[in-house]
């Protein structure tokens, strides 16, 4: 699969890097890169599961990024102006230092003045916590300061959380709990301002739902969740852990009713050719042009990504990439242009078969336009020390649909740097 890298031309300006690039399907595409923070943990610990968000745009147009820092604290930085400008990003606001380092935080706004961060760690290793965050603003709506509340433990023996905002202003979170030799389970919880944390399917229950349970394969499941904005159905898709012999995806969905959601029957072999491990976790995005959920996964032993369009009835259509011109693909996430319906697939080109947990590489992207994928990747960052990608997702009332934007971590040791990227027309 080894292929030569594309030619690129790079210009440096103080604190901001503007990269002008050429690719076979993109003519003079450009990206702006700016450093947001310099105290991050390495990417596999600092950034969330790909289906969640660490970079958000609030209802007032302000950008906020959430990450785990090198000391294990939860950290928040924000930009009240253009996030691509020098000096746009604030100094980090930090949580109190936990007993066990926080990892893989997923952030959700619950109002212009509040957000919640779901993360691993806190009181003990293996805990999953809900950290409330207060957002102070000036009269112009600019963020003035961030303050952290006290964390609440949602679960123990938990990992790989995915959290989303829902149409009713609430939150739904999923996570995995794997018991060696016994089972691997994906659970779910729902939060609303009125009820706090309850079952997704029963607002009177404080017991999490069992979304997926596999008693034949007790390896990790890295699952992500999304809500359809048309019928409010929830979809959960996940891949297997790195030590699994299975190359299957797992799936479940929940229909929305008067009192909440009702989970359907799980599918432990939704696809049968998926790569394993965190760096190949599935990604979920909404395509408003076609009214489909788009599930992205790395096809095992290839340089291709499986791209599945899932309609409201649950039917799926594959629009997979061709073999991409890279050595090895990791950390794939997909964004949809809500105006054109074009797909932008961000991935990292890493050395062949990197050790588990060492999937560092070049940041790249390719595009599906007018129904056709380009096999040639456009280079964003040629450093081989990058790990993890978190995309900006459009959310109801919170913007995020004007440009394709991501953040990623740069550095093989902590402290690492977090970079913000905007693709420009």
What label would you give each PLM region?
Residues 1-7:
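N-terminal secretory signal peptides that target proteins for export/translocation
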Residues 12-24:
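Bacterial N-terminal signal peptides
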Residues 29-425:
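Extracellular, repeat-based ectodomains that mediate carbohydrate processing or recognition
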